[in-house]
Structure formats: structure tokens, C-alpha cells
UniProtKB/Swiss-Prot annotation:
InterPro entries reported for this sequence: 4Fe4S_Fe-S-bd, 4Fe4S_Fe_S_CS, FDH_Electron_Transfer_Unit, TAT_signal_bac_arc
Keyword set includes Iron: yes
GO MF, one annotated term: 4 iron, 4 sulfur cluster binding
Alphabetic keyword roster: 4Fe-4S, Iron, Iron-sulfur, Metal-binding, Oxidoreductase, Periplasm, Repeat, Signal
Organism whose genome encodes this protein: Escherichia coli (strain K12)
Domain 4Fe-4S ferredoxin-type: 38-68, 103-134, 136-165
Cell location: Periplasm
Signal peptide (from-to): 1-27
Lineage of the organism: Bacteria, Pseudomonadati, Pseudomonadota, Gammaproteobacteria, Enterobacterales
Name of this chain's protein: Hydrogenase-2 operon protein HybA
Maturation and modification: Exported by the Tat system. The position of the signal peptide cleavage has not been experimentally proven. Can also be exported by the Sec system.
Binding annotation for [4Fe-4S] cluster 3: 112, 115, 120, 155
Amino acid sequence: MNRRNFIKAASCGALLTGALPSVSHAAAENRPPIPGSLGMLYDSTLCVGCQACVTKCQDINFPERNPQGEQTWSNNDKLSPYTNNIIQVWTSGTGVNKDQEENGYAYIKKQCMHCVDPNCVSVCPVSALKKDPKTGIVHYDKDVCTGCRYCMVACPYNVPKYDYNNPFGALHKCELCNQKGVERLDKGGLPGCVEVCPAGAVIFGTREELMAEAKKRLALKPGSEYHYPRQTLKSGDTYLHTVPKYYPHLYGEKEGGGTQVLVLTGVPYENLDLPKLDDLSTGARSENIQHTLYKGMMLPLAVLAGLTVLVRRNTKNDHHDGGDDHES
């Protein structure tokens, strides 16, 4: 290729690059909650820390207990391949005043939050994690899972746990007791933890009705009395209890795009190891980045293809012309 054709090709490449639109950085958007999606409301102020929910969860999901031995408060307060649901306690100072920041303590229930737009689903390369299109429950398929554990890194709540002792490998997380082989919800039952909670600290229902109930509680006057329901809002099983001073925030309404497990507390949620997250879901953010990268890759490839065709054509013309014209 002579100098004239080289300059011509370079100029055309620059024009092609300038003519192509720049990569769009349109803001990612949250996926809307599935209408009627199922979830739980956990009211930390009602929890008595009995761990009945933990035991029931293990009875349903792990009939063979952790081989490390009997579970007690000291070794059963962390999520593991043998425990999908746990109760942790936070303390401050002397730790004698329930749901108080000063010299107080509070309980927190930990399990999969069933995010509205879950990042674990977004990052899974083989779709071993899927969000049920009707219930919104995040389900796991062990037969598809490759054990890459991307979901463990992606989860902002550090929920999925991998069983390294299983020769085939397996992930464990809460599926609201409706996974294949259990299907309590499909059979008309309740998640085990909801069924056995004596204080109604965790109740089951649609995200919409649970959110309405949570906001109703936040509007109650501290010191007044309220009929708190057990199991579900429509169970008819309620008990009269003094309204605490709630921390004025419903966790899970907007955090990370929203969750189907909602939390009310009497102390700042940061104290209970609930992460502070942006309103934009992690799933939406990661997918937007992926799509932007893929779109961005196409532009330089298109330019490169155009330049390649132009160079090949000019090279062929050079052969026909008999070589360089030696212009300076």
C-alpha cells in the first residue's frame, strides 16, 4: 500500500469511528416487583431468640444434621451448608435493654432475602439460580450448578453457602421451603420458620400486604397496644402486645432494588449487620455493565472490519498499478 492509500485508509477509519454512535451509558433500571410475589416480614422487636425457626428449618431441609455435632447458640448462629436460617444477637454495653442502642440487645433473622432483582441470578453462567416468575422465590437447581460460586461473591447479604464436603458439590440457601422435593407452599403449607414462630416475629404473605403491614406498624404510637398476627395476616391468630419504638425504616423496601423478605427493627439496621445498599439493584447494575461492554465491543469491531476491507482493496489495486508511485 502506498502512502496516499494509507492516509486515505486512516482517514476513512477516523471518519467511520466518528460516524458510529458512542457507547450508550443509559442508566440501569430496577425490575419491578412481581405482583403477588411471596415473602416474609421479620419484626426484630417481637423476636425472643428461641431459635424454634432454626430447628424447624433444619428438620425440613436438613434431616441429617451437621456432622460436627449438636447445634447450640454458640455454634448455630451462622449460615452454613447445614443451616439456611439463623438467629443472631447484637449487644451493646451491658446488653440488658431489648431493642435499645445503649446497653441493649436485639435479634436478627438471617436467610436469603429473595431480592426483587437478584444479583446471584444475574451472575450465574448456567442459570442454576432462577427467580420463579409467579412467586418471585429464588430457586436453586443443583443438577445444573457447575460449582463456580459466582453467586457467593455476588450476593450482598453473603447468603449462599457451598458444601465443600459433598463430593459433587452443592449450594445451600433458603427457598421458602418450596424447593423441589419439599414444596410446602405448593401443598398449602407455610415456610417452616413461619409455622413455628410463637411470637409472630416472622409472618408470611405477599410482598404488597407485608409492606402495608410494616408501614402500619411504623405509624403506630410507641407504648400503645396492637394485635400482632401470627403466621399470616389472615390467620385470625393474634395477640395483644405493646408497640415498641421502631427504628423509622423498613429494610428491604428499596435496598438493592428491594427484597421480598422485609425487616423491622428497634435499632439501626446497620447494627444488625444488614448492609447499606443503593436503591439500584445489584442485578440491574451488573447486567447493564455487561450489556454496555458487549455493545461497546461491536463498535471497534465494525471499524476494524471496514478498515480491513479497505486495506485489502487498496493492496489489490497496488498490485495492478505496479507498485509505489513514490509521491512525497
